[in-house]
Amino acid sequence: MQKKLQVEAIEHGSVIDHIPVQQGVKIIRFFNLTQTNEKITIGLNLATHTGQKKDLIKVENTFISDKQANQLALFAPHATINQIKDFKVVNKFQVQLPDSFIDVLACPNSNCISHHEPVDTRFYVKKKSTLKLKCHYCEKTFDHLFFSELD
């Protein structure tokens, strides 16, 4: 059986692979990738070699930083980042869930002081397996799904 690319190759840039189904569009929104002039290719519900489905994002002429890669773990904890130069993978790494997120997310608790005072939001990762985050200020713990729709 001949292999066939489901999404066009890029010359230079980043490929975010192994994104869970229905998370690709959320990642595009979260990172404001629609605000760039670079070509963005997104594959949704692509078949994997195991017969499962995944999403995939390719961003030309843009390289994902370590900080951005770690933020991706909120949406895709098993995603990999491929850095492409001259159509070849020059670096490949898996996202790593950081111990904390600073000034990335808004607290879902509307009574949290972070909504009323000029402070940077701060969340600590309390449980990595099911991804639970604890707010530094109100000390409430939230499932990561509370954050998946935030802009």
From Swiss-Prot:
Cofactor(s) listed: Zn(2+)
Gene3D superfamilies: Aspartate carbamoyltransferase regulatory subunit, C-terminal domain, Aspartate carbamoyltransferase regulatory subunit, N-terminal domain
Gene Ontology cellular-component terms listed: aspartate carbamoyltransferase complex
GO MF entries: metal ion binding
Pfam families hit by this protein: PyrI, PyrI_C
Keywords: Metal-binding, Pyrimidine biosynthesis, Zinc
Highest taxon of the lineage: Bacteria
GO annotation, biological process: 'de novo' pyrimidine nucleobase biosynthetic process; pyrimidine nucleotide biosynthetic process
Disulfide bonding pattern of the chain: none
Signal peptide: none
Residue sites binding Zn(2+) per the record: C107, C112, C135, C138
Protein family: Belongs to the PyrI family.
Entry function: Involved in allosteric regulation of aspartate carbamoyltransferase.
Annotated protein name in UniProt: Aspartate carbamoyltransferase regulatory chain
